[in-house]
Amino acid sequence: MSAMNTPDSIDDEARYRALCSHDARFDGRFFTAVTSTGIYCRPVCRVRTPRRENCRFFEHAAQAEQAGFRPCLRCRPELAPLQRHWSVEDARSILVQQATQWLDNPQNWPGAIEGGATVARLASRLGVSDRHLRRIFEDRLGVSPLQYLLTRKLLAAKQMLADTALPITQIALASGFASLRRFNTAFGDHYGLSPGQMRRQPLSADSQRDGTPVQLFWRPPFDVAALLRFLAERQLPGIEHVQPDAPLGLQRTARVESGGLTHTGWFSVRFDPDANRLGLQVSDSLLPVLPAVIWRVRALFDLDANPLAINSALHADFPAGDGLRVPGCFDGFELAVRAILGQQITVAAARTLAIRLTERLGEAITTPHPRLHRLFPTAQALASVSPDILGELGIVRQRQAALQSLARAVVEGGLVLNAFADAHTTTQALQALPGIGPWTAQYIAMRALRWPDAWPVGDVALIKTLGIEGRGRAAALEADRQSAAWRPWRSYAVIRAWAGTHANPILTSGVPSP
């Protein structure tokens, strides 16, 4: 196999070939720094291809910026999909991937550039010393955790400068800087321009109306329609509206908590599969938390997936599934509630219960979109509601106990349901709650925690796909054995198995209901 086709170990010559061909499959997997200009670019950049001897290659934008290169204003490295290195065996790799997940989450950014306190806080959450974290991080990525974080924040600010009409002071706060002075200093030191100079191009009329447009990119292939069909079958009226046919898109209401404040509003997405991108419009009310909204939307649509790595492990067994992604969620608590409601019933029945719950406990919201007028219930609302009310909605007692135990755990802070949470610890915590078994816990890990190696034990559709139904407990053991070759991408294997089991991929009631 040539270096170009090896997903996790391409050499510089293969990178240069990808650059010459503007290969979108490598977008975000490396950046090219040009020594003659001092600029670094994405592989898809359409400027004149630099000479090979003038190119240096970096795996992360933070590495290029540490070496003194500035981001290209044309291809805009801040728009590239994020790079993920998943492992289920290497403890150091697992530590680094957990650290980068935390640093990538904009909800952890406010005030986070205040020196070593950030590293100490992160290390404490990971259960290691800050010295050990810095050493492992620098060994694996070539930059310190603070350097990585600063690059992520500055690139987010750069995107807002280019795509929104937000005042620079608000951009500084939204990208996690404690003051405008700190922001201006960091921006100027890194990019050689002030934020005002970076925003030299006049904003379009679209950027100055409610619903700020933002571009988000992905690596192909991506079967957008399949993912939207999955979401459309489960959509909740008033909260979301999914368009699985042209024009491909989604609209939904949103709630984001950040810095002790709650922001509510709406967003709308339109997909452009030919350009490997989507257009995201966000209500003005969500602009103060725009980086967090972008981060969640990327998770919802699995935009940072690495198809080359995934397909290298799964294509032989699932050749028709190369474009399938794992549907994520915008809010982990909402996903967990809907997963519990869907236990042992059909998709349609689970959706009916979720609609009733939303109509009874969800808050009303005013938007310019007639189909969007309600927010999903908060954990506090569900934790405090009378079980009798849940019973009136048709939710049986066992599910009531599971839902309210989940809600209380989230309210008390003992349960975190996002991509930073450790998959093993969180699934164990979920299973310790009444009425939540291994299948549901793994399903939540797959979609809310964005864990690529989730494995819903005993999944009927999966066992049928593997041709081992009718063997009782032996079937689950055999499924585990066969799945070893798919690690660390078993979540994607599950999605492909569900699609391959039915004539209408991902859309029939035979697919698990949550």
What are these regions (language model features)?
Residues 1-514:
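HhH-family (HhH-GPD) DNA N-glycosylase catalytic core used in base-excision repair
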